[in-house]
Amino acid sequence: MKSLPIIGITMGDPVGVGPEIIVKTLKNKDIYKICRPLVIGDLKVMEQAESLIRSGLDFRPAGSPEDAAYEYGRVDILPVSDLDPARLAPKTPCAKTGEAMVKYITTAVDYARDNRIQAVTTGPIQKAAVHAAGYTFAGHTELLAQRTGTSKYVMMLAGDKLRVVLVTIHMAVSEIPAHVTREKFIETVEVTGQALKERFGIPQPKMAVAALNPHAGEEGAFGTEERDVIIPAMEHFKGSDIALDGPWPADTLFYHAQQGKWDAVVCMYHDQGLIPFKMIHFHDGVNTTLGLPIIRTSVDHGTAYDLAGTGKADHGSMEAAIRMAALQASNLK
């Protein structure tokens, strides 16, 4: 057991589905065969979630990762906050829960940087609550990058059938062409290639490149970004151990990608990658941040206030995220 990686699982929003899906996931005994799970959150909130799910699990507060027992049936939790669930408005973001969410994340990141845990799996957070607590970062990824001093990082969405990475992430569609640059493309491919080799065990990664424009621009008739930016940037990798294929029109690319033709697809913008990904991996998709000095995976969904407190939230993405964190940690040994 001691040879298995310790995965710090942040609870996410105390009034979202995070606590419930963690309980459901840790009911699966197989999780303890691949890692040592450590919940970083709030003891009372987790006990409330257990009373709803009735999984039969007990929760044991631990003072540190070294103090945890990692025994199936007795979930170890680092109680970073001490909230009173009865005083929290259900399904409602507030500054108190926002502050707690940030503390869960920063605690986990700091333990991972010190190698006291080997990976972090994050539960869903509510950005309005985080902003109400006085923080201005856009989301998990930006906070993780700031906390670890990382300037070059890539968002990957990963599942058994498809992996996608994004050259641009959260911005208006009208702004995308100006941000699809040679420098950003090369950075995205380099970070992704390194992660595929080191964390996914793929020594010579093959990646498809999605075109920005319909029909890959059709010789400039529908845009020139392929001709002027993407294809010249792809030339940078000729002769390297990263093989690039494309740029392919996005309307046909994903049919072949989900059949395993490539190890990842480089997408130019958010919805180009996430729409096909979620069509395939809606219940078991994983968000993992590449380029950080720590391993971070996350569920591929939000706080789901409409399901919070019902016990009906699907835990497939949380289980998949923990499994992927354990895989990456094992490959890095």
Curated annotation (Swiss-Prot):
Substrate binds at H140, T141, K278, N287, R296. Pfam families: PdxA. It catalyses: 4-(phosphooxy)-L-threonine + NAD(+) = 3-amino-2-oxopropyl phosphate + CO2 + NADH. Pathway: Cofactor biosynthesis; pyridoxine 5'-phosphate biosynthesis; pyridoxine 5'-phosphate from D-erythrose 4-phosphate: step 4/5. Its main location: cytoplasm. Coiled coil: none annotated. Its cofactor is Zn(2+); Mg(2+); Co(2+). It is found in: Cytoplasm. Binds 1 divalent metal cation per subunit. Can use ions such as Zn(2+), Mg(2+) or Co(2+). A divalent metal cation binds at H170, H215, H270. One of its GO terms (biological process) is pyridoxine biosynthetic process. One of its GO terms (molecular function) is metal ion binding. GO terms for cellular component: cytoplasm. Belongs to the PdxA family. Homodimer. HAMAP family: PdxA (MF_00536). Catalyzes the NAD(P)-dependent oxidation of 4-(phosphooxy)-L-threonine (HTP) into 2-amino-3-oxo-4-(phosphooxy)butyric acid which spontaneously decarboxylates to form 3-amino-2-oxopropyl phosphate (AHAP). The active site is located at the dimer interface. This is 4-hydroxythreonine-4-phosphate dehydrogenase. It comes from Desulfatibacillum aliphaticivorans. The lineage of its organism: Bacteria, Pseudomonadati, Thermodesulfobacteriota, Desulfobacteria, Desulfobacterales. The gene is pdxA.
